[in-house]
């Protein structure tokens, strides 16, 4: 016999699933896996760089980011304006091309090339494919994630750490 609690649980899970799918379809850009080509597109579109969201399927922190931060309209708008945005599954065997044109897998791109060991890792690359900022773990809030975007877009990474930048921003308010 199906109970109302089972129906509620099923509907709740479906709701989370659709919120997750919405975040994935709106926030992330579609790619054929050639990041060297994506760099060229980012230059042509006058973006600040490329944002890579390193993730794992069963990662609760990745899930929280997708369902509570990456699905927010102002977040989507800001990041789409300034970055090409891609997901990389750190366990993925999908073949891809790195920024320098080397063929690899998502797993090797994450582990060997960028030493990703925990998820999520929020990685920002400049228009030459050079890693300029990296944040390991989920941000504590949408505001912190937006501040991280501002930190990269306005080039603060060149002169200070994100932790120091956050502290300066709090003191100036």
Regions found by a protein language model. Name each.
Residues 1-6:
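Positively charged n-region of N-terminal signal peptides that target proteins for export
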Residues 7-17:
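Bacterial N-terminal signal peptides
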Residues 18-22:
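Sec/Tat signal peptide C-region and signal peptidase I cleavage site
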Residues 23-46, 158-173:
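N-terminal leader/targeting and pre-domain segments
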Residues 30-32, 75-104:
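Thiol-based oxidoreductase modules, predominantly thioredoxin-like and allied folds used
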Residues 45-60:
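Short active-site neighborhood of thiol/selenol oxidoreductases, capturing the structured segment around
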Residues 63-80:
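Typically the conserved alpha-helix immediately C-terminal to a functionally engaged Cys/Sec
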Residues 109-158:
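Non-catalytic, surface beta->alpha helical segment in thiol-disulfide oxidoreductase systems
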């Amino acid at each position: 016999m199906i109970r109302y609690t089972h129906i509620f649980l099923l509907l709740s899970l479906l709701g989370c699933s659709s919120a997750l799918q919405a975040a994935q379809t709106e926030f992330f850009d579609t790619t054929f896996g050639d990041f060297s080509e994506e760099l060229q597109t980012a230059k042509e579109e006058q973006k600040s760089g490329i944002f890579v969201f390193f993730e794992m399927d069963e990662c609760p922190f990745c899930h929280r980011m997708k369902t509570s931060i990456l699905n927010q309209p102002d977040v989507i708008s800001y990041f789409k304006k300034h970055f090409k945005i891609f997901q990389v599954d750190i366990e993925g065997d999908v073949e891809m091309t790195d920024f320098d044109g080397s063929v690899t897998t998502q797993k090797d791109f994450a582990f060997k090339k960028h030493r990703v060991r925990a998820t999520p890792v929020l990685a920002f690359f400049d228009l030459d494919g050079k890693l300029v900022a990296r944040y390991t773990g989920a941000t504590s809030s949408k505001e912190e994630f937006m501040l991280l975007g501002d930190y990269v877009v306005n080039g603060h990474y060149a002169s200070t750490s994100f932790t120091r930048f956050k502290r300066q921003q709090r003191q100036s308010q």
